[in-house]
Amino acid sequence: MNAYAGLLSDEETKHNLQACKKGQYSSSNNQGISKSVLDRYCVCYVNKIDQNLTQKDIKYFKENGTYPERYNQVVFESSKQCYLKEIAK
């Protein structure tokens, strides 16, 4: 597995990876895409999210139960970059 920035615990990373895979496997948009490709997408996606999280984001999440607004852009960019890298190639 790729190296992570380390802000998310191993348990959080594992949970995020499982959630990504579950969502990708069940999406009607992904019919015909192999699980191995979707797995690579999810590893890329979770890794990119973790690389872009800051200590401030984690603190905000712990205090508010949600991530700050900028997190939506992190999610969008991570998804787009990993889609282009792993699925659309």
Regions found by a protein language model. Give the residues of each.
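Boundary at the C-terminal end of the N-terminal hydrophobic targeting segment
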Residues: 3-5
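Compact alpha-helical subdomains of small soluble proteins
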Residues: 36-89
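Short N-proximal segments of mature Sec-exported proteins
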Residues: 10-54
